[in-house]
Design a protein with these regions (language model features):
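A sequence/structural signal for flexible, mid-protein segments enriched
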Residues: 17-293
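Sec-dependent bacterial lipoprotein signal peptides
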Residues: 1-14
Length: 293
């Protein structure tokens, strides 16, 4: 996500301005972008990413913010590469703990934010796949993914990512959703998302978009989100579709980072996974629903 967040937020800055001076697009580089998402998974690298917004009008990499002091609850994150601040190996967050992020830039500006982990919200027992056809909507092939489990009675919000053999979809192909269709219910074979194979996408993003073969492992990774972070992510995906000329102006993008000229979010999320091994990539039904087939 850190590659796309500065660009997406730059689009929102442009879209939220009634009059845009094309000669002063460098002004958008004045905003710090904070991408800080920590999880309860000790095997997941816990990072805080700092960059600057980039102009909507130029194809350029977001400038990385180097030399900052970044800490969470007084634990210092070390800069592992330009703009990427990494927690010690094995560090992870825990339910019921409040987390305080502090950022001090080399020029002396300070930023801070607070977050706590929401309840998991869903017990994920398993997933399954079904072939849905090929040459559909310009895609080479399409599969649907269904989930099994139990949703809690509380309102919950999720960020869902798919992976094939450990290669995961990029941020713009992930999914955000609430639980309005299965709140407080046992879930058996609910079609949650789709997996696509496209040679064009495979060449651009890697083997997450490969054609499924026997023995491939499909993994669904889900994160439970607090409502503010869900709204923030939704703003990145929905408001940027309104950029073309004559479209309505979106609302200002939300942030929970305190400080001047700053965008982004600090979130703490429980993370859970389920996987299925492909037996027959052309199987047109969920075997977990029809095990006798």
């Amino acid at each position: 996500m850190r590659k796309y967040l500065p660009f997406l937020l730059s689009l929102l800055l442009a879209a939220c301005t009634e009059k845009v001076d094309l000669q002063s697009v460098s002004d958008y580089n004045d905003y710090l972008v904070v991408d800080a998402v920590l999880t309860d998974n000790p095997d997941h690298e816990q990072t805080v990413n700092l960059s600057r917004t980039v102009s909507y009008f130029f194809d350029e990499e977001p400038p990385r913010v180097q030399g900052a002091r970044v800490s969470v609850n007084d634990l210092v994150f070390e800069e592992s590469e330009p703009g990427v601040y990494l927690a010690p190996r094995g560090y992870h967050c825990e339910p019921g703990t409040k987390y305080h992020l502090q950022i001090e830039l080399p020029e002396g500006r300070n930023y801070e934010a607070d977050a706590s982990m929401p309840e998991r919200g869903f017990r994920l027992d398993g997933i399954d796949y079904a072939f849905a056809g090929n040459k559909s909507m310009g895609l080479d092939s399409l599969w649907t993914l269904a989930i099994w489990g139990k949703d809690d009675a509380i309102a919950s919000y999720y960020h869902i990512t798919l992976g094939v053999n450990g290669d995961y979809y990029p941020f713009e192909y992930t999914q955000f959703m609430d639980d309005k269709y299965f709140n407080d219910k046992e879930v058996k074979g609910f079609p949650i998302t789709t997996l696509v194979q496209s040679e064009v996408l495979r060449k651009r993003y890697g083997d997450a978009f490969k054609y499924l073969e026997t023995g491939d492992v499909i993994t669904l990774r889900a994160r439970s989100l607090e409502k503010g972070y869900f709204d923030f992510l939704l703003a990145q995906t929905l408001n940027t579709t309104s950029i073309p000329i004559f479209s309505p102006q979106p609302a200002n993008t939300p942030t929970n980072i305190r400080g001047e000229h700053v965008l982004g979010w600090f979130a703490v999320c429980p993370e859970f996974y389920a996987s299925v091994t492909v037996e027959d990539p052309f199987r047109p039904y969920y075997k977990k629903l029809f095990p006798w087939f």
